[in-house]
Amino acid sequence: MTSSSKDMKAGSVLQSSGEERRRGPLDQLPPPANSNKPLTPFSIEDILNKPSVKKSVGSLCPPRVLEKVTGSSASRNGISAPSSPLCALEELASKTFKGLEVSVIQAAEGREHINAFGQRQASKKRRKSRTAFTNHQIYELEKRFLYQKYLSPADRDQIAQQLGLTNAQVITWFQNRRAKLKRDLEEMKADVESLKKIPPQALQKLVSMEDMEDAHGGSGPISPSLSPRAFPQSPSSSRGQTTDEFSEEDEEIEVDD
């Protein structure tokens, strides 16, 4: 009996040792602290039996990035957090784009200043001094313009040498004089068209009034429609005028002395 009981005990010991060898390493681990949480053999936290740690935003981004997001200065409070590659890349990109934006704005402002300066210089170049002709020069030019509206190169040289002017000044004066004559003709045509629209009775009345004024010695007032100012002056009557009167339209040209 004793030998058989010993054999049974030895067999049970061997059986228990065999069962222990057949058990895996996971079966030998102590139970978790939280019994309500199910075991997951493939989880590192369950194997090491450590509670999960929630990472804060400060562990992912540096204090300067947190200041932009939350508006609080972590560096002033003495809080330092490790920076991640993603946050470092974001910070570098923001600095790069900020520098590019500043450079683009400065370049645009520089171009605006250059353009404004160029416009001022161009406007100054357009303004040219007018040539002051003497009465004798204007008289000779008007006399020549009566029978010759366009000058040949030889005539232009002759007049310039005779009056002590340059070829450019002679060309400019004749161009301005032709422009003035064109305006006078257009005004005369407009006056004629306006007179055509007046009824014959009104014209007859105006003529009779003019005859009465002539009979009384012309002491009465002159009708505005028959005033000499209503009609353009002849080219010969413009003697003694200055060149400013010949340069009223954009088509007239100015030259330097």
UniProtKB/Swiss-Prot annotation:
Transmembrane segments: none
Location in or out of the cell: Nucleus
Biased composition (Acidic residues): 245-257
DNA-binding region in chain numbering: 126-185
Gene3D superfamilies named in the record: Homeodomain-like
The keyword Hydrolase is assigned to this record: no
Residues covered by region (Required for convergent extension movement and hypaxial myogenesis during gastrulation. Required for the formation of thick and thin myofilaments. Required for myod1 expression in the pectoral fin bud. Required for continuous expression of cxcl12a in the posterior lateral mesoderm at the tail bud stage and in adaxial cells at the 10-somite stage): 1-46
Gene Ontology annotations for the cellular component aspect, listed alphabetically: nucleus
Main location: nucleus
Bias-annotated ranges (Polar residues): 233-243
BP terms from Gene Ontology: embryonic axis specification; muscle cell development; muscle cell differentiation; positive regulation of convergent extension involved in gastrulation; positive regulation of non-canonical Wnt signaling pathway; posterior lateral line neuromast deposition; posterior lateral line neuromast primordium migration; regulation of canonical Wnt signaling pathway
Sequence segments annotated as region (Disordered): 1-43, 206-257
Phenotype reported upon loss of the gene: Morpholino knockdown results in circling swimming behavior at the larval stage. Reduced fin bud formation and loss of myod1 expression in embryo hyoid muscles. Disruption of cuboidal morphology of adaxial cell pseudo-epithelium, and failure of myod1-expressing cells to incorporate into the adaxial cell layer. Slow muscle fibers are abnormally shaped at 24 hpf and 48 hpf and fast muscle cells form shorter myofibrils at 24 hpf and 48 hpf, in addition unfused fast muscles cells are present at 48 hpf.
Gene Ontology MF terms in the entry: DNA-binding transcription factor activity, RNA polymerase II-specific; sequence-specific double-stranded DNA binding
CDD domains, per database record: homeodomain
Any Pfam family hit: Homeodomain
Domain of life, source organism: Eukaryota
InterPro entries: HD, Homeobox_CS, Homeodomain-like_sf, HTH_motif, LBX_TF
Annotated SUPFAM superfamilies: Homeodomain-like
Keywords per UniProt: Developmental protein, DNA-binding, Homeobox, Nucleus
Stored PANTHER family: TRANSCRIPTION FACTOR LBX, TRANSCRIPTION FACTOR LBX2
Function of the molecule: Transcription factor required in several developmental processes. Involved in axis formation during embryonic development by inhibiting tle3a/gro2 from binding to tcf7l1a, thereby facilitating ctnnb1-mediated transcription of canonical Wnt/CTNNB1 signaling target genes. Regulates convergent extension movements and hypaxial myogenesis during gastrulation by activating non-canonical Wnt signaling via wnt5b. Required for the formation of myofibrils and fusion of fast muscle precursor cells, potentially via transcriptional regulation of genes specific to thick and thin myofilaments.
Name of the protein: Transcription factor LBX2
Highest classification ranks of the organism: Eukaryota, Metazoa, Chordata, Craniata, Vertebrata
Annotated gene: lbx2
